[in-house]
UniProtKB/Swiss-Prot annotation:
The keyword Acetylation does not apply. Residues 43-46 are periplasmic. The core complex is formed by different alpha and beta chains, binding bacteriochlorophyll molecules, and arranged most probably in tetrameric structures disposed around the reaction center. Residues 2-19 are cytoplasmic. The lineage of its organism: Bacteria, Pseudomonadati, Pseudomonadota, Alphaproteobacteria, Rhodospirillales. It is a single-pass type II membrane protein. One of its GO terms (biological process) is photosynthesis, light reaction. It comes from Magnetospirillum molischianum (Rhodospirillum molischianum). A bacteriochlorophyll binds at residues 18, 36. This is Light-harvesting protein B-800/850 beta 1 chain. The keyword Membrane applies. Its main location: membrane. It comes from the Bacteria.
Length: 46
């Protein structure tokens, strides 16, 4: 009998989900950094 993980995903599925998460999280961080720079250029906060 195969071991079941807490999430119910296989090792391959978990790797695929993690890779997609890393990609979207990195895109979010880059977008947030660009937004902060643009606001800083528009109206410096200190």
């Amino acid at each position: 009998m195969a071991e079941r993980s807490l999430s119910g995903l296989t090792e391959e599925e978990a790797i695929a989900v993690h890779d997609q998460f890393k990609t979207t999280f990195s895109a979010f961080i880059i977008l947030a950094a660009v937004a902060h720079v643009l606001v800083w250029v528009w109206k410096p906060w200190f």
